[in-house]
């Protein structure tokens, strides 16, 4: 690894943390690289409900422990992801002993035990938790996503979850996290939800803007308006899952073996503009996490087109800095 390449996180030391989503295999193969460029890590999947709590009386913390131990040993922050989500939650959470629907009381008891155990295990080691993930509906005529959490617990499940997480670790920053967060309609739904939670006294310390964007959109104005709207609630903002796909969402092509020159140039300019904007709001934005480490691995290789390579980050498939890296480095 070239020593002449400056550390990405060090170059933003006066602005915000620079993070990456990781899994345990990466720590073994890319640990030195991760430690050089990132001062925050998020478990991409290995802290999700079904990963750490597959059966009611069984917890599997080996992978999560490995990530936390790696980070703590190197002075790297950890974001916890995620406690309450409609995906990757095991069926037993919503069922009683006979396979019927669990009662509200049973679910609240289970949720508290889960949060107490998971958050409590990493107390004072995880600086922020995505407590509730993606509870807002994308369709314009609905507000809350229709999930088992909502159907069985009612809307106050969010308040309950935040209160439980705060009890388990009073020092952790607690976030509501969502995608399409720059869309004006969904933006207002997220704003109103978090404002309502705050009005109810819920310990919500921040909003997670996922940042699954592409080289064409959303517009810089939409990103700026979302930042300003959320910041007006006087909460911290984290960009939690940043990647810039080289494809529009509706683009189904599968024939590219590398990005076109136009894609690469658009991505460089977008990264430069976006990080300039983030830096402008560094009093509000305290952490920016990429949803991966480098182009050698990204969830976008299988979404929305399965098996299609994507190149969404500032490091290439060989862990070398792309031109976009040099566009955003040294902006502090």
UniProtKB/Swiss-Prot annotation:
Keyword Zinc-finger: no
Swiss-Prot/TrEMBL keywords: Carbohydrate metabolism, Cytoplasm, Glycosidase, Hydrolase, Polysaccharide degradation, Xylan degradation
Temperature dependence: Optimum temperature is 50 degrees Celsius. Loses 100% activity after incubation for 15 minutes at 50 degrees Celsius.
Ways its activity is controlled: Completely inhibited by Ag(2+), Cu(2+), Hg(2+), Mn(2+), Pb(2+) and Sn(2+). Strongly inhibited by Fe(2+) and Zn(2+). Co(2+) and Ni(2+) cause little inhibition while Ca(2+) and Mg(2+) do not affect enzyme activity, and Ba(2+) produces a small stimulating effect. Irreversibly inactivated by SDS in vitro.
Record-level Gene Ontology MF annotations: endo-1,4-beta-xylanase activity
Enzymatic reactions: Endohydrolysis of (1->4)-beta-D-xylosidic linkages in xylans
Active site: 134, 241
Coiled coil: none
EC number, UniProt record: 3.2.1.8
Taxonomic superkingdom: Bacteria
PROSITE patterns assigned to the protein according to its UniProt record, in alphabetical order: GH10_2
Localization, UniProt: Cytoplasm
Gene Ontology annotations of biological process type: xylan catabolic process
Activity at various pH: Optimum pH is 5.5. Shows more than 75% of maximum activity from pH 5 to 10. Is still active at pH 12.
Pathway in which this enzyme or protein is active: Glycan degradation; xylan degradation
Annotated PANTHER family: ENDO-1,4-BETA-XYLANASE A, GLYCOSYL HYDROLASE
Function: Plays a role in plant xylan biodegradation, probably via the hydrolysis of short xylooligosaccharides resulting from extracellular xylan hydrolysis, once they have been transported inside cells. Shows similar activity on xylans of different rate of arabinose or methylglucuronic substitution. Also displays high activity on aryl-xylosides. Is active on xylotetraose and xylotriose, but does not hydrolyze xylobiose, indicating that XynB is a xylanase and not a beta-xylosidase.
Family: Belongs to the glycosyl hydrolase 10 (cellulase F) family. Cytoplasmic xylanase subfamily.
Name of the featured protein: Endo-1,4-beta-xylanase B
Taxonomic placement: Bacteria, Bacillati, Bacillota, Bacilli, Bacillales
